[in-house]
């Protein structure tokens, strides 16, 4: 079972880690509230994960060493850097949300008060004694108010993804809550995401309109695409290319292609650099599977040793730190442990 716990198909991991640029979310994603975070990287998933298609952002780069007091879900990781403007104030950037989303990865491990304390410590580690520290704390309180407001929605804001009217209402509700709680921070936090969701919803409305002929649909979709900013069009083209690459990787795996054959095929369609990244990912994946299987066996021994929950959790956390030394690996292992229904 241990090996299966750590395994993820290479095509899916290609999407997660961005083999060929931006990762694509195919189709319509689940509309969810602010639930616990689970992810393969240090940043995890954003709490406002609702999206009608779109592009998944890459995990932010770690900026400062992790403190010794991190909860198990963040063990072995470091917080993303909080950006500052030229005047030393907190920059109005999506990176600020990424910082808070990193901290929210520990939500399942901590009480609300302990989570607040964690955020206060992580902010102080970067901004202690600065005006930006006060600003970051204020934005955190606003963000918490946003998440709390989402949680009050019916079914925490979850809707039937086939009901376009409900999707439209959910978008409007979230935008209203974001503006009410975050104020001028709502745009850097959610502006690009909301625009993308509305664009994708408009596409769905066109494609599902039975009163239109195929030619009319194509005409309206083309007109809609022309409304897309140039940078968004370029991003969409990259998404389309990556989606095709992911499909190709899945087909090659399904056909039992050897690593050399897969690399040769991908070199023809993606180029040598992307093919080399896939090959490296295959090697990294094999290494991960082996180390996770060994770790899971040792973890099972600890779990069966009759220790108190506190001692058991401490020993497993220490084991993760010894086995998984690269950034984000211990977080990934802890996430897989929770998903497997083990100690965490």
Curated annotation (Swiss-Prot):
InterPro entries named in the record: Lipase_chaperone
Upper classification of the organism: Bacteria, Pseudomonadati, Pseudomonadota, Betaproteobacteria, Burkholderiales
Keywords: Cell inner membrane, Cell membrane, Chaperone, Lipid degradation, Lipid metabolism, Membrane, Transmembrane, Transmembrane helix
GO biological process: lipid catabolic process; protein folding
Family to which this protein belongs: Belongs to the lipase chaperone family.
Organism whose genome encodes this protein: Burkholderia cenocepacia (strain HI2424)
Name of this chain's protein: Lipase chaperone
Lipid bilayer topology: Single-pass membrane protein
Function: May be involved in the folding of the extracellular lipase during its passage through the periplasm.
GO CC aspect terms: plasma membrane
Pfam families: Lipase_chap
Transmembrane segments: 14-34
Location of this chain's protein in the cell: Cell inner membrane
One Gene Ontology molecular-function label: unfolded protein binding
């Amino acid at each position: 079972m241990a090996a299966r716990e750590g395994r993820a198909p290479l095509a899916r991991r290609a999407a997660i880690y961005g083999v060929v640029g931006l990762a694509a979310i195919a189709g319509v994603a689940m509309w969810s509230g602010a639930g616990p975070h689970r992810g393969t990287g240090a940043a995890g998933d954003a709490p406002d994960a609702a999206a009608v298609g779109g592009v998944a952002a890459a995990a932010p780069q770690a900026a400062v060493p992790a403190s010794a007091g991190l909860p198990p879900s963040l063990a072995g990781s470091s917080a993303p850097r909080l950006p500052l403007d030229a005047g030393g104030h907190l920059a109005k950037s999506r990176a600020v949300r990424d910082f808070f989303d990193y901290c929210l990865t520990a939500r399942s491990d901590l009480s609300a008060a302990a989570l607040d304390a964690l955020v206060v410590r992580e902010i102080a580690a970067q901004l202690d004694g600065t005006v930006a520290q006060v600003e970051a704390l204020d934005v955190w309180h606003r963000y918490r108010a946003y998440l709390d407001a989402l949680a009050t929605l019916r079914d925490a804001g979850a809707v039937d993804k086939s009901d376009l009217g409900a999707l439209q209402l959910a978008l409007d509700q979230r935008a209203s809550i974001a503006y009410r709680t975050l104020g001028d921070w709502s745009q850097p936090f959610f502006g690009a995401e909301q625009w993308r969701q509305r664009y994708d919803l408009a596409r769905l409305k066109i494609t599902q309109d039975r009163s239109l002929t195929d030619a009319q649909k194509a005409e309206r979709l083309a007109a809609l695409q022309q409304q897309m900013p140039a940078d968004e069009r370029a991003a969409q083209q990259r998404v389309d290319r990556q989606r095709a690459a992911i499909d190709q990787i899945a087909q090659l795996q399904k056909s039992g292609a050897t690593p050399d054959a897969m690399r040769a095929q991908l070199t023809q369609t993606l180029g040598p650099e992307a093919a080399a990244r896939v090959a490296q990912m295959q090697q990294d994946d094999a290494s991960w599977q082996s180390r996770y299987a060994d770790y899971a066996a040792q973890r099972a021994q600890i779990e069966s040793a009759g220790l108190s929950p506190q001692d058991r959790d401490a020993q497993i956390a220490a084991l993760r730190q010894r086995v998984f030394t690269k950034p984000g690996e211990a977080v990934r292992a802890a996430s897989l442990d929770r998903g497997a229904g083990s100690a965490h």
